[in-house]
């Protein structure tokens, strides 16, 4: 952090412009705004003095320095500091948030990923303030609607319809907790897995084959069959319509052709089918016939004790990857997007934080005569992380919810709140 950035933070706290600030450390004036705090020897918890020079010949602060801690709040009295902090908890200062985004690349990347609209206006203070306040207002409206709904449920908890809604809240909390556990213990399940390809040769023509043990037969596209010079061997009597996720036209079958896998030359039959962007798909008929083993630990297809390594992601041709990158997606109610073919999560749900349960249903019941209780998980994140977020002006509940949504990642939680 530079002296110039520190003056901007002091300005956001005190409304004193940087041109009127004179920072003093160990009775020495910090006049070079381009230097960093480390270069001038300022460390965590050190005390600085701020001399304020007023324009228009007004008397300046006579020899009295206004003490301020790095990242802290300056003020004349303890009561004013407490009041100012309470006000910041209610309305976080947009300029302080903006400077924090610009000063930390990790936070900036997290905000760009979670809130691109806000990240795009981070360099414009006025536009940033407008966008942030608009988003906060919409969030407050949603919270107010949620609280109003919860209050209505609390008014008549024995109503059967209210019980159904309470049950749904409990279910949503369980789903959210399951999501958090999955993100914490095996986050790789939310990523996209590279498909299995191996280099092969068919009738002397080199190509990359997609290994798919879920396909019943080995499939080849008409263009690939033409390039391999085996289109003339297609038996149209085996034509038809293939039905699955969609429909495709089967032109026929090549009963036998030579395929080279590794150093082995093997006989193989191909079903020529339209509608496939993949040139060659090795199905279960081919794999079972030659007793192939998909060894994921070795990252290879093993046939007759010979291992043929799968292609790495960088070795797979781009047009083959685009086949799965451009796949149709299924959208959920909260904005989650899941690939229709691969099942990969391409966009996580927006409402990942658990919905707060009604206050009257917060405790577990011991008898069946009482209405169902809504369990709200207790905070399980370090107090240091919560304290760093509350220093930015957010409440403790907001900090806890953000850490839950970000799976404990401090930078991600700050980006989620911003």
From Swiss-Prot:
Annotated segments matching region Disordered: 58-89, 346-382
Principal location: cytoplasm
InterPro entries registered for this protein in UniProt: DDI1_N, Peptidase_aspartic_DDI1-type, Peptidase_aspartic_dom_sf, UBA, UBA-like_sf, Ubiquitin-like_dom, Ubiquitin-like_domsf
Compositional bias annotation for Low complexity: 80-89, 349-372
GO molecular function: aspartic-type endopeptidase activity
Keyword annotations from UniProtKB, A to Z: Aspartyl protease, Cytoplasm, Hydrolase, Protease, Protein transport, Transport
Pfam family, one: Asp_protease
Gene3D superfamilies membership: Acid Proteases, DNA helicase RuvA subunit, C-terminal domain, Phosphatidylinositol 3-kinase Catalytic Subunit, Chain A, domain 1
Subunit structure: Binds ubiquitin and polyubiquitinated proteins.
PANTHER family noted in UniProt: ASPARTYL PROTEASE DDI-RELATED, AT13091P
Protein name, entry field: DNA damage-inducible protein 1
Organism: Emericella nidulans (strain FGSC A4 / ATCC 38163 / CBS 112.46 / NRRL 194 / M139)
Lineage: Eukaryota, Fungi, Dikarya, Ascomycota, Pezizomycotina
Gene (UniProt): ddi1
